[in-house]
Amino acid sequence: MKFIGLVGTNSKRSTNRQLLQYIQKHFADKADIELVEIKDFPVFNKPANKQLPENVLEVVKKIEEADGVIIGTPEYDHSIPAVLMNALAWVSYGVFPLLNKPVMITGASYGTLGASRAQLQLRQILNAPEIKANVLPDEFLLSHSLQAFDGNGDLVDLLGIQTMEVLHFHRQG
């Protein structure tokens, strides 16, 4: 199976990117997970010629060719980051790569709630008629993410690893 791991932030030191890298490594024997950055997308503005920027088209193609998408979102002020909203606007402008595409939402945050409010908002956005992704019912919340990884980038929380395993197998069933 092939998945796209969409890094939903432009932060250089993101624990959401770390989480996606861990998922990529942890499930390497079960799936090919390619991490995709959105930080270089231009600010969305409906282009007069209706042409998408080349870097957006590349991501659209990767999503279309994937069996599913895993989106890692941080939470800023109870919301998804502007860069993620910007990317979703681009990949739903006249193209529909996420239409009925299975999407799993993950989120890491420094605090206790693990990006739960951003994940709720992201779920609503992904259900919009212009996107209409098949958002999976489960989501993975990683709280206290600054302390969640060891020096090798592995999760140190056994419960978090077990939860991720359960979600993975639930998704496969």
Per-range role (PLM):
Residues 1-94, 151-169:
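N-terminal beta1-alpha1-beta2 submodule of the flavodoxin-like/Rossmannoid cofactor-binding fold
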